[in-house]
Amino acid sequence: MNGYVEFSPSPTKESVEPQPSQAVLQEDVDMSSGSSGHENCSMGRDSQGSDCDDNGKELRMLVEPSDTHSSPDAFRLMMTEPQHNPSTSGCSSEQSAKANAHKELIRTLRELKVHLPADKKAKGKASTLAILKYALRSVKQVKANEEYYQLLMSSESQPCSMDVPSYTVEQVEGITSEYIVKNADMFAVAVSLVSGKILYISNQVASIFHCKKDAFSDAKFVEFLAPHDVSVFHSYTTPYKLPPWSMCCGVDSFTQECMEEKSFFCRVSVGKHHESEIRYQPFRMTPYLVKVQEQQGAESQLCCLLLAERIHSGYEAPRIPPEKRIFTTTHIPNCLFQDVDERAVPLLGYLPQDLIETPVLVQLHPSDRPLMLAIHKKILQAGGQPFDYSPIRFRARNGEYITLDTSWSSFINPWSRKISFIIGRHKVRVGPLNEDVFAASPCPEGKTPHPSIQELTEQIHRLLMQPVPHSGSSGYGSLGSNGSHEHLMSQTSSSDSNGHEESRWRKSGISKNGSKTQTRSHFSHESGEQKEIAVTEMQSSTPAQAKAAPTVERDSSGSSLPKASFPEELAYKNQPACSYQQISCLDSVIRYLESCNEAATLKRKCEFPANIPSRKATVSPGLHAEEAAPPPSKVSSHAEVRARLSSLTLPDKAESVVSLTSQCSYSSTIVHVGDKKPQPELETVEDAVSGPESLDGAPGGLSQEKGPLQKLGLTKEVLAAHTQREEQGFLQRFREVSRLGALQAHRQNYRAQASERAAPGLRNASGMDSSWKKTGKNRKLKSKRVKTRDSSESTGSGGPVSHRPPLVGLNATAWSPSDTSQSSCPSAPFPAPVPAYPLPVFEAPGITSTPAPPEAAHSSFTVPVVPMGAQPDFAVQPLPLAAPLAPVLAFMLPSYPFPPANPNLSHAFFPGQPHFPAQPTFASEMTPASQADFPSQTPLLRQQCTCPVTPPAATVTSGRASPPLFQSRGSSPLQLNLLQLEEAPEGSTGAAGTSGTTGTAAAGLDCTPGTSRDRQPKAPSTCKEPSDTQNSDALSTSSDLLNLLLAEDLCSATGSALSGSGASATSDSLGSGSLGCDASRSGAGSSDTSHTSKYFGSIDSSENNHKAKVSTDTEESEQFIKYVLQDPIWLLVANTDDSVMMTYQLPSRDLESVLREGRERLKLLQRAQPRFTEGQRRELREVHPWVQTGGLPAAIDVAECVYCKSERKGDICLPYEEDSPSPGLCDTSEAKEEEGEQLTGPRIEAQT
């Protein structure tokens, strides 16, 4: 009874009354009880008493159709009846028949036991129940596959059969014979995809399987496959996946490549080779799709034509050579095989499907399993780089172990920075003792893994869930660090923005894009604590802010901060911080899309609310083309230039400086990798965010750090250190900018109204208000420049500015570009004007909030002065002034930095320029309070410059692709600042001369009147002038370096400054199209408080209206006024047409003499450049192959340089040497040549 009680079917099945189908039911019962008896009698023989007899009695009893079995109660009685009534089993003919059936059942069960996989045997014995369940499952699987094929063929037979060749059976034999005749281990078989039956099989099967060919006739091919390979066979023989036979028949011989590409592995067997088991042989099968006509006149049916080749052990003849016993595997962090190389089949004995999704550790020798933890630790440290490790022992299918030399690497998810899968490359060192690796293992391991395996797997999984600390070369690790990727990424993603990750990306940057890494190294001077602050703050920042900030940094034209004001961007508070790589990556994508053309820019505008004028004018590499030959009269080109320049000024963009700047800047970028000078931008941001505070001590602090350039080798370590610090600074700056987002919400409507009211001529190509486009970047760089130049006092913070002595030779001009707010006197007055280019100045309307008509500004160059009382909300401490100084727009020659006023110079160098009195009293509408007289300043009456409203050639606009003075030898603000810092010890003459130092209208380089006007505060500005306007020129004094940079980048893209359109990037800064000739400008520039960048001082009438609307938030105005920037007047000059500038030009110098002097200076400067040792050169050659070949990297090896017009590929770009000096700017050209030579020197050495 034991067997029956254990394995009997459900009583409900047996309680059915006898019917015609009762025979089948009885047969099932016979199988159950018979198998039980067989198990206990023939196999187990471990049960007590007469179990077999009882089972026989049960069998005979159950098969009798009896009405007493019609209920469960009767069934229970039936179960107990044999015990109490042994006489029920009589000897009759029916009983003998049942006994024969029983014997047949036992034989069938024995046959089934042979097919039962070893892993399903309990304790090495085949359970009868397990056998029956396995058989039932196999039948269901085959039947399901057949049904699947029927459905598949009914829906796909027509499309598939259109191009499929049709053959008869004889033709199939003929076409396949040429492929199998040369290989005795190969056979061909045609399997119907409709019925699954074998329509044709070659004669080789008889020798391969040692059976007759008739064994395959009218049989289904899947019946000969190992049960667990049936699904593999079906998956690879789906009709739409099969290539037609025509692909193969056109070739003389079947190529191995073709087989490897489409082949799969299955085990095939015809029958049992031994009485106890069936030996399956592994085959590589290559399927093709054909049509076969089974009989003459019958309809052709789709078939799968298989070319099957038997696989031999790689250690048996013909052996695989030891040097070729190599295969690869991949597994995922939870230590399950993900993929196994086909080359592993003859070496391990496993088919790919045998190992996939099985534990790796199970296949290893128990003593080698702990090594996997150490291996995975090193994998994590290597960050994708391959490395070798000690040999491990891997178990083959026959149960023996093979010693493998292993090499490991990994693929890193580019977003999560976690390992996605591990790649192992294995080479067989020692083969198995039993060379037949396909033999079955004598002691198969149980299905349940050992507890130690589970524990070790969990440890490895936890380990690999950590972010990878090094980038290495795997996957995206190297991708994220090209120049265009770098800086958007700090936002979007994972919490992996840590020092390890940054070092990882840093390495990647070094290996993939030297120029980018080197450029990034300029901004790597921020301290570690700043980086920590950045990380913590970013983690607390909102994702929307994160998105806004990179966009901000990307735009950096002032549109950045307004974007942060979206309420939805402030919605989520405690989101994880985004990584540096993700921010820069997203930023590069967005910048690229926006740089394609104006249409792309307009397309991006759809992403934002309609009240936002535009995301930005596009800070993008796409402007390079525009720089080469800008259409002078196009508003769009100017607008893009404006955006481009603004983006250059943003410190946060330093990471992608290479992608933003000209190709010529590459060599200059390389030079400054070793530069250790600190960057003050981060401090500026901190100042801006923390509240108004004086930046008085900043220049002094910087001057102390302006030591001579240290001679440092361009090693991987130096680049890595710079890169890490730069990323830290980037994250910090991003966070600081993001914090400003909360203060911007109230300006959303303001900006929308501004964009609506803005005059068409004053708009950017992107429709963005130029008034606020500049705030983002210029704000920070303004403060940076304050620290860079000691001569400047930063009022960018909007806080009270500490008293500083005036700079000698600088004319402190209070320039009031706004109709609503007259500019206050600068914080530091300067004794006298320097000979200057007279530019038209516009009368500033009264301090009323009514915007002045744009047309009223042409005729005169008057400078209204705003009293200090007009801006009480800004605690700016003005220096005493005798009188407001006239905003005489002067261009400071490089050779005359801050000279005392000398009227004679004006005639000597400016024949057409009228003499300026020392500084006569300037009658202004209002005098600033608490102004002390300066002895050198005499009252100046408001006077009008005799500059024609429209210069003679105002209508003639020539798109000067690259004026020599403003060509970019290092077009990023960072590069230029570093250059200036380097040259400062030698004398700031050249740098100071070339870059406009604000502080003087006549002598200061930054003579752009619309200084404060050009900056649009991040908060609504009041009608009163912010303190920034008072110190506007002083602010630009510190920005001289940046001004020079911007002018350089602007040179090729400014177009005509005389066009009068608001898009003129630099002409806007004066409030006049160019030289004050823009009829659309208002007053003396417009809107002091709008603080549009002086560089693009297109103060729209809309800005004036803006100021009429914004009136009260003075505290926030103070907060945002810190980000105001001022522009130098020479930007106007740069954009002025040559025909106009002829009136004011200096005597031209001989081009050859200029070049000769420049080359001499270059030779002198080269001596101070770093010298590379042989080891350092080897490192450079390893990281940058182009160093060895001597050219530029392919990415930037352009045929024509957009600045110097050099058409020689790979030529060292020496800007300014090939261009004749700009009229009146010869000394500046010299200074630029000097800087350009200094930059390119180390590059020449590096290439040698």
Swiss-Prot record:
Locus of motif Nuclear export signal 3: 974-981
Region CSNK1E binding domain, residue ranges: 506-706
Tissue: Expressed in the brain, mainly in the suprachiasmatic nucleus (SCN). Expression also found in the harderian gland, lung, eye, intestine, liver and skeletal muscle.
Amino acid composition bias (Basic residues), ranges on this chain: 774-787
Domain PAS: from-to ranges: 175-242, 315-381
Modified residues (Phosphoserine): 521, 524, 527, 540, 656, 690, 694, 703, 755, 930, 962, 1117
Region of interest: Important for protein stability: 474-478
GO MF annotations in UniProt: transcription cis-regulatory region binding; transcription coactivator activity; transcription corepressor binding
Location(s), subcellular: Nucleus; Cytoplasm; Cytoplasm, Perinuclear region
Primary localization class, coarse: nucleus
Biased composition (Polar residues): 9-24, 32-50, 510-521, 1083-1102
Methyltransferase found in the keyword field: no
Motif (Nuclear localization signal): 773-789
Low complexity composition bias: residue spans: 816-827, 987-1004, 1057-1080
Locus of motif LXXLL: 302-306, 1042-1046
Function, as annotated: Transcriptional repressor which forms a core component of the circadian clock. The circadian clock, an internal time-keeping system, regulates various physiological processes through the generation of approximately 24 hour circadian rhythms in gene expression, which are translated into rhythms in metabolism and behavior. It is derived from the Latin roots 'circa' (about) and 'diem' (day) and acts as an important regulator of a wide array of physiological functions including metabolism, sleep, body temperature, blood pressure, endocrine, immune, cardiovascular, and renal function.
Protein name, per record: Period circadian protein homolog 2
Designated gene of the protein: PER2
